[in-house]
Amino acid sequence: MGRDGLPTAGGYSQGITVEQDYVCHIPDSIPLDKAAPILCAGITLYSPLTRWGAGPGKKVAIVGMGGLGHMGVQISAALGAETHVISRTRSKEADARRFGAVELHPTSEPGTWESMAGQFDLLVSTLSDGVELDDLVACVKPEGVVAVVGLPEHRQEFLMRNVVNDQKIIAGSSIGGIAKTQEVLNFCAAHDLSL
């Protein structure tokens, strides 16, 4: 039953009624099938990227090139940040560059983690497993931010001194509110992003 007491048809419905405070306008330039991912994965990446200042003069790393990561790369690059991808292998390097990354760092190759030490202002991890938090923290500059949007199944441990000594920040982020969702829709339309 719906709020009005009438039966609902779920996914078979021809229309819905919602409160206007929870409606976003999808710009005409975004086809509806392209808008759907922006409303979940797009806002999930846009929120920490804008909150932590991705933009011109900033060096940003997106960890993982899956559904979330490929959106993060496009959004970060469109914000004007020097955007990098951290991935296990080079298999997605062409996509990373096509989406706006200047470099892909393959962690399966020797010396990759060491070469990234202290390189990034902001690192956004989309991974749910397979990387140690200490490795991510080591990649950001003093006062840099590691924003985690992936949800690991197991406990994450790290050495607190790796955060404290350089005043680094570890933050979590999960989607965004209605105003921020409208903002990412408008941003994607303005930058012609086809997420």
Regions found by a protein language model. Give the residues of each.
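Glycine-rich phosphate/adenylate-binding loop and adjacent beta-alpha elements
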Residues: 1-23
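A glycine-rich, Thr/Ser-enriched phosphate-binding loop motif common to dinucleotide/cofactor-binding enzymes
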Residues: 7-12, 28-51, 63-71
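Glycine-rich helix-loop-beta junction characteristic of Rossmann-like nucleotide cofactor-binding loops
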Residues: 49-55, 138
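Adenosine-nucleotide cofactor-binding segment
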Residues: 56-65, 77-135
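Helix-to-beta-strand junctions that scaffold the AdoMet/dcAdoMet cofactor pocket
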Residues: 140-142
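Glycine-centered, small-residue-biased loops immediately flanking beta-strands
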Residues: 144-145, 168
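Acidic carboxylate diad motif detector
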Residues: 149-150
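C-terminal substrate-binding/catalytic core of Rossmann-like NAD(P)-dependent dehydrogenases/reductases
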Residues: 153-195
